[in-house]
Amino acid sequence: MHELIEERWSARGYDPDATISAEEITDILEAGRWAPTWGRIQPVRFIVGLRGDATFEQLAAALNRGNKGWAPSAGALILVCTSDAADDAKLHDYGAVDLGLAVAQMSIQAVSMGINPHPMAGFDASAARTAFDVPADKRPMVILALGRLADDPTLLDPDVTDRDSQPRERLPLSEIAFAGRWGEPFTAAK
């Protein structure tokens, strides 16, 4: 597995004084822009807030309670939206796939730059839609926090430090990758 994928994790212990430049955000957005897209429809859109600007404040206000405790320390918050075509199931479904691919590529790009990405579904999508005049044919799905980790975690909220110190775990491949039929683990040929 590539080391950037191994290094990626959704931290919360951001340095509230660290900034992310417009140039760095542009590189991260470019990674999202160049993500694979079904039928070249390119349905993903971004609303970008840098800490201290009005967009950032509106995005932070839309966060659910659990995310409001740590995400405002991020250097940037990005609302990621995609197509919401109620009359076109393919467009609706593939728009979500395209969004996931874009966020994944943005996350890996961020890690390569020493920036920690944390995608969140815990926000009020209706409030975000209203705050930013998101059109009816788009749906806000994710807010991506981007930040630099604090050098001294003892200065952070103990709940954040505790959560960030938990091991990063995933189910074993034998429980998620199958061959032949559902539940039969995939095994590499020897």
Regions found by a protein language model. Give the residues of each.
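Acidic, surface-exposed loops and disordered segments
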Residues: 1-190
